[in-house]
Amino acid sequence: MNFQPLGKRVLVKRVEEANTTASGIIIPDNAQEKPSRGEVVAVSSEVKEMLCGDKVLFGKFSGSEVTLDGEKFLIIDSEDIFGIIK
């Protein structure tokens, strides 16, 4: 994929979370919350705090969902990312 975010934005691929509870109950797709974790796929030249491959935590309603090469991603302002998961 060839995509370069502009401004202070990053392109993030959501990390899918388990769809079962600890006790084994399966949660249907329409009842699941959208994941608020992801992996940075592309970074604007203005963003210095993050690198491609970083695992990040962001708000549930952050960013704009886009489809590139048949995959869903989020374009998020770097200020809407809470932190990097180490």
Swiss-Prot record:
The keyword Chaperone applies. Keywords: Chaperone, Cytoplasm. GO terms for cellular component: cytoplasm. GO terms for molecular function: ATP binding; metal ion binding; protein folding chaperone; protein-folding chaperone binding; unfolded protein binding. Transmembrane segments: none annotated. It is found in: Cytoplasm. The keyword Lipid biosynthesis does not apply. It comes from the Bacteria. One of its GO terms (biological process) is chaperone cofactor-dependent protein refolding. Together with the chaperonin GroEL, plays an essential role in assisting protein folding. The GroEL-GroES system forms a nano-cage that allows encapsulation of the non-native substrate proteins and provides a physical environment optimized to promote and accelerate protein folding. GroES binds to the apical surface of the GroEL ring, thereby capping the opening of the GroEL channel. Heptamer of 7 subunits arranged in a ring. Interacts with the chaperonin GroEL. Belongs to the GroES chaperonin family. This is Co-chaperonin GroES. It comes from Sulfurimonas denitrificans (strain ATCC 33889 / DSM 1251) (Thiomicrospira denitrificans (strain ATCC 33889 / DSM 1251)).
